[in-house]
Amino acid sequence: MKTTLDYVDAVKIKHDLPSDYALAKLLGVSKQAVSNYRLGKGGFDDLTAVRVAELLDLNPMEVIAVANRERAKSEDARRVWTGLFDRFAANFEGLLGMMGQRPALRAA
Protein backbone atom coordinates (compact mmCIF):
# COMPACT_ATOMS: atom_id res chain seq x y z
CA MET A 1 0.00 0.00 0.00
CA LYS A 2 1.23 3.47 -0.78
CA THR A 3 2.23 5.95 1.92
CA THR A 4 2.03 9.69 2.46
CA LEU A 5 5.71 9.90 1.52
CA ASP A 6 5.03 8.18 -1.82
CA TYR A 7 2.44 10.83 -2.65
CA VAL A 8 4.63 13.70 -1.40
CA ASP A 9 7.47 12.58 -3.66
CA ALA A 10 5.11 12.04 -6.60
CA VAL A 11 3.68 15.58 -6.34
CA LYS A 12 7.15 17.06 -6.07
CA ILE A 13 8.35 15.17 -9.15
CA LYS A 14 5.22 15.68 -11.27
CA HIS A 15 5.15 19.41 -10.62
CA ASP A 16 8.96 19.80 -10.81
CA LEU A 17 9.13 21.48 -7.41
CA PRO A 18 12.61 22.57 -6.31
CA SER A 19 12.03 22.30 -2.56
CA ASP A 20 9.76 21.13 0.20
CA TYR A 21 8.92 24.80 0.78
CA ALA A 22 7.51 24.97 -2.77
CA LEU A 23 5.61 21.75 -2.11
CA ALA A 24 4.16 23.16 1.11
CA LYS A 25 2.97 26.27 -0.73
CA LEU A 26 1.35 24.18 -3.47
CA LEU A 27 -0.42 21.96 -0.93
CA GLY A 28 -1.44 24.88 1.28
CA VAL A 29 0.30 23.45 4.35
CA SER A 30 3.23 24.55 6.47
CA LYS A 31 6.83 23.57 5.77
CA GLN A 32 6.71 21.80 9.14
CA ALA A 33 3.78 19.68 7.93
CA VAL A 34 5.84 18.55 4.92
CA SER A 35 8.76 17.77 7.25
CA ASN A 36 6.41 15.71 9.41
CA TYR A 37 5.18 13.80 6.34
CA ARG A 38 8.80 13.00 5.46
CA LEU A 39 9.64 11.89 8.99
CA GLY A 40 6.50 9.77 9.34
CA LYS A 41 5.29 11.96 12.21
CA GLY A 42 2.06 12.98 10.52
CA GLY A 43 -0.09 12.29 7.53
CA PHE A 44 -2.44 14.25 5.34
CA ASP A 45 -5.72 15.51 6.69
CA ASP A 46 -8.62 14.72 4.35
CA LEU A 47 -8.55 18.12 2.64
CA THR A 48 -4.83 17.83 1.89
CA ALA A 49 -5.41 14.27 0.67
CA VAL A 50 -7.96 15.60 -1.82
CA ARG A 51 -5.53 18.31 -2.98
CA VAL A 52 -2.81 15.71 -3.47
CA ALA A 53 -5.17 13.48 -5.45
CA GLU A 54 -6.14 16.38 -7.70
CA LEU A 55 -2.49 17.30 -8.29
CA LEU A 56 -1.72 13.69 -9.25
CA ASP A 57 -4.94 13.08 -11.23
CA LEU A 58 -6.00 10.31 -8.84
CA ASN A 59 -9.33 9.42 -7.32
CA PRO A 60 -9.40 11.26 -3.96
CA MET A 61 -10.67 8.14 -2.14
CA GLU A 62 -7.36 6.40 -2.82
CA VAL A 63 -5.34 9.09 -1.03
CA ILE A 64 -7.97 9.60 1.70
CA ALA A 65 -7.89 5.86 2.50
CA VAL A 66 -4.09 5.90 2.77
CA ALA A 67 -4.12 9.03 4.96
CA ASN A 68 -6.75 7.59 7.29
CA ARG A 69 -4.89 4.30 7.54
CA GLU A 70 -1.78 6.16 8.65
CA ARG A 71 -3.74 8.22 11.19
CA ALA A 72 -5.62 5.23 12.60
CA LYS A 73 -5.08 4.68 16.30
CA SER A 74 -5.97 0.98 16.35
CA GLU A 75 -5.08 -2.05 14.30
CA ASP A 76 -8.80 -2.60 13.61
CA ALA A 77 -9.11 0.88 12.10
CA ARG A 78 -5.96 0.32 10.01
CA ARG A 79 -7.47 -2.92 8.68
CA VAL A 80 -10.69 -1.11 7.74
CA TRP A 81 -8.84 1.59 5.78
CA THR A 82 -6.49 -0.95 4.17
CA GLY A 83 -9.50 -3.01 3.12
CA LEU A 84 -11.20 0.05 1.67
CA PHE A 85 -8.08 0.92 -0.31
CA ASP A 86 -7.72 -2.65 -1.57
CA ARG A 87 -11.39 -2.81 -2.64
CA PHE A 88 -11.12 0.56 -4.35
CA ALA A 89 -7.93 -0.49 -6.13
CA ALA A 90 -9.42 -3.80 -7.27
CA ASN A 91 -12.61 -2.17 -8.54
CA PHE A 92 -10.71 0.61 -10.27
CA GLU A 93 -8.25 -1.80 -11.88
CA GLY A 94 -11.17 -3.93 -13.05
CA LEU A 95 -12.87 -0.93 -14.60
CA LEU A 96 -9.71 0.15 -16.36
CA GLY A 97 -9.07 -3.42 -17.45
CA MET A 98 -12.42 -3.37 -19.24
CA MET A 99 -11.23 -0.20 -20.96
CA GLY A 100 -7.90 -1.81 -21.93
CA GLN A 101 -5.70 0.03 -19.40
CA ARG A 102 -3.69 -1.41 -16.48
CA PRO A 103 -2.42 1.04 -13.84
CA ALA A 104 -0.27 0.05 -10.88
CA LEU A 105 -2.47 1.08 -7.95
CA ARG A 106 -1.31 -1.55 -5.50
CA ALA A 107 2.02 -1.11 -3.82
CA ALA A 108 3.68 -3.44 -1.35
Model regions: which residues?
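Short, charged recognition helix plus adjacent turn
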Residues: 65-108
